[in-house]
UniProtKB/Swiss-Prot annotation:
Pfam families: CBS, HcyBio. The keyword Amino-acid biosynthesis applies. This is L-aspartate semialdehyde sulfurtransferase. Disulfide bonds: none annotated. SMART domains: CBS. S-adenosyl-L-methionine binds at residues 439, 456, 460, 479-482. Keywords: Amino-acid biosynthesis, CBS domain, Methionine biosynthesis, Repeat, Transferase. Pathway: Amino-acid biosynthesis. The keyword Transferase applies. The lineage of its organism: Archaea, Methanobacteriati, Methanobacteriota, Methanomada group, Methanococci. Belongs to the L-aspartate semialdehyde sulfurtransferase family. S-methyl-5'-thioadenosine binds at residues 395, 399, 421, 497-500. GO terms for molecular function: transferase activity.
Length: 509
């Protein structure tokens, strides 16, 4: 069996004799030559990814002013940085919004970071509390990346091994970290580099760990050299993540890009590339993983819960084709829909990361490192936060009516049951509209005769497993005082009103 060492591979790199290929190129080599010959021939496989990595940020040491200040509240271009460290140390997070509500997420922490990498001036404003050794109360200066002592990028969670795709079952579009999701499953968004993904290429499914990547692994980070410093937050193979660090002063704005997800927040697109030493045949075989080999779950992001419904399972080859067929339920009907797919990450840039890293190694500018420890194994635990669901406050049994009744008959139902909302259903109990006591009053004033003339047909609804908080937001957004609760087949199972929610929150107080 072929066995190499990183030391031997580094010697070949220094001599200009190493064979280095990208993960894309490795697929063809293994297909044509087999894993054994590929392991003998290839020394290093380069990988790459380029996507939105919200859990990113930079530690900055500004140097001491004269007289010195102990910074308490720190702002960079009006974006707050965390200052609970030493006197002039701070951490600026990529997802931090702007303090100006008119700017908000359009210019956040990610934009500050990109501006620094681009060499632009950034306004630093800091407030402090005075001490004998730090007498200054505030400072307001303009700085560039060259002016600060250190700017160390430390990203708690980057480089997802597997990223779920997203779709939306709701009747309105929603705004998420996966971009804008259209109503009624009308698009699917995905993220990730697939066959170029670093952790996919290094994963060992038998041990549920990684073959070569670990603490101390040298990497390509944002156009400079960085290191893996541990497993990332929420690391849980086969959903692995990495915590990485690198010198911001070495980085290239081509591979560090700020972005804003509409109505969600600012984020930082980061280019990460990791070299995988081909130490044996098994590693060579894994480095030939293809898009069609990587399973991607598609979840319904229209369901406002931590555990979202699984809609389908697919792979990156299908997702990259630009369309996908889903079997879904809409208004109680099982339908087959072919919809567009879209990526919120860049495969083109991921390829460029892998190609750039490959050239660095071929030029002898980048040597591999031995990991000093493997990545930890962790079990993700949910937050222990209480939640009240719609079914917990649901008014049952539902009082409903059919659309063929008169205005007077509807008014009698409202008075008899002391209610203000009356869902209108068809012969199968499926929701077709709703009327309120206000609708009745208007109908009488306008001499309307039938329910069909006055009912609202485009009805905002809720589900039993929906959080009450979310329903309250929905009612406020659409300026309504009640929502029918329906099942998966749009049959009415109850109703939630503003009075129900007021009683709930009043009881909490």
């Amino acid at each position: 069996m072929i066995m190499k060492t990183i030391k031997e591979i580094n010697e070949k790199i220094k001599k200009g004799e190493a064979v280095v290929v990208t993960a894309e190129e490795m697929i063809k080599i293994v297909e044509e030559e087999g894993a054994k010959r590929a392991a003998d021939y290839v020394d290093v496989v380069t990988t790459g990814t380029f996507g939105a990595m919200c859990s990113s940020g930079v530690f900055i040491n500004f140097g001491h002013s004269d007289p010195p200040i102990k910074m308490l509240r720190i702002y960079l271009n009006n974006v707050e940085a965390y200052g609970g460290l030493a006197a002039v140390d701070a951490y600026i997070g990529a997802a931090q919004p702007n303090e100006d509500p008119d700017v908000d997420i359009d210019y956040g922490g990610a934009h500050v970071i990109e501006d620094l990498v681009r060499g632009k001036e950034v306004e630093l404003y800091a407030e402090g509390y005075t001490t004998d050794c730090y007498p200054r109360k505030e400072v307001n200066v303009r700085i560039t990346l060259d002016d600060v002592n250190q700017a160390i990028m430390v990203n708690p969670r980057n480089c997802y091994q597997t990223y779920a795709a997203a779709t939306n079952s709701r009747e309105e579009k929603i705004y998420t970290y996966m971009g804008i999701l259209l109503p009624e499953y009308n698009n699917v968004h995905y993220s990730g580099a697939g066959q170029l993904n670093p952790l996919q290429n290094d994963y060992n499914p038998e041990t549920k760990s990684f073959n070569t990547i670990g603490i101390g692994t040298r990497i390509f980070l944002g156009g400079g050299i960085g290191y893996v410093i541990g497993e990332g937050t929420q690391h849980n193979p086969p959903f692995g993540t990495l915590m990485v660090k690198g010198d911001l002063k070495q980085m290239n704005p081509k591979f560090i890009r700020a972005a804003t997800m509409p109505r969600y927040g600012s984020t930082l697109y980061v280019g990460i590339g990791i070299p995988i030493p081909v130490l044996n045949e098994k590693i060579a075989e894994r480095c030939a993983i293809r898009d069609e080999d990587i399973e991607v779950p598609i979840y319904d992001y229209g369901f406002p819960r931590r555990d979202r419904p699984l809609i389908a399972k697919t792979n990156y080859k299908v997702l990259r084709s630009g369309k996908i067929t889903l079997n879904v339920n809409i208004d109680g009907k099982d339908v087959e829909k072919t919809v567009k797919t879209g990526s919120v990450s860049s495969y083109k840039m991921a390829r460029e990361v892998a190609e750039t890293l490959k050239q660095w190694i071929l030029d002898g500018k980048f040597l591999l490192t031995e990991r000093v420890d493997t990545l930890g194994r962790a079990e993700n635990k949910p937050m222990k936060s209480p939640i009240t669901l719609v079914k917990d406050i649901l008014s049952k049994p539902p009082i409903t009516a059919h659309s063929n009744i008169s205005i007077m008959e509807a008014a009698k139902i409202l008075i008899k049951h002391n209610i203000n909302h009356l869902p209108i259903v068809d012969e199968h109990g499926k929701l077709v509209g709703i009327i309120t006591s206000w609708d009745i009053a208007k109908a009488l004033a306008q001499n309307k005769k039938t329910i069909e003339e006055i009912m609202t047909r485009n009805v905002i609804t809720a589900h039993e497993d929906e959080p009450v908080d979310h329903v309250a937001i929905k009612m406020s957004k659409y300026n309504i005082s009640g929502v029918p609760v329906v099942d998966d087949y749009r049959r009415v199972v109850g109703i939630v009103t503003s009075e129900d929610i007021s009683r709930l929150f009043g009881g909490k107080k």
